[in-house]
Amino acid sequence: MPIIKSAIKRVKTTEKANAKNSSQLSKMRTAVKKFEKAKTAGADNVEQLFNEAVSAIDKAQSKGLIKANKAARDKSRMAARLAK
């Protein structure tokens, strides 16, 4: 437990940022899983779910939660899966 005032503030800030980042990553993963599940099941709204997943990946990448290469790789794999 920090004693210095600035260290106490950093702990609070870090916890808040960690919660926000975890939430954003979770949303991204959920969107990708929904797309995968819909594609496997042969649902009608696969295009919409694909767009939502790509949007979630782009948001995570722009916030620095995932690297640009991972974002591109994930989107490419999903696009290839959509085309099948």
UniProtKB/Swiss-Prot annotation:
Give the function comment from the record: Binds directly to 16S ribosomal RNA.
Q: Name one GO molecular function term.
A: small ribosomal subunit rRNA binding
Q: Name one GO biological process term.
A: translation
What family does this belong to? Answer: Belongs to the bacterial ribosomal protein bS20 family.
Keywords, A to Z, come to:
Ribonucleoprotein, Ribosomal protein, RNA-binding, rRNA-binding
This one is known as Small ribosomal subunit protein bS20
Listed GO CC annotations: cytosol; small ribosomal subunit
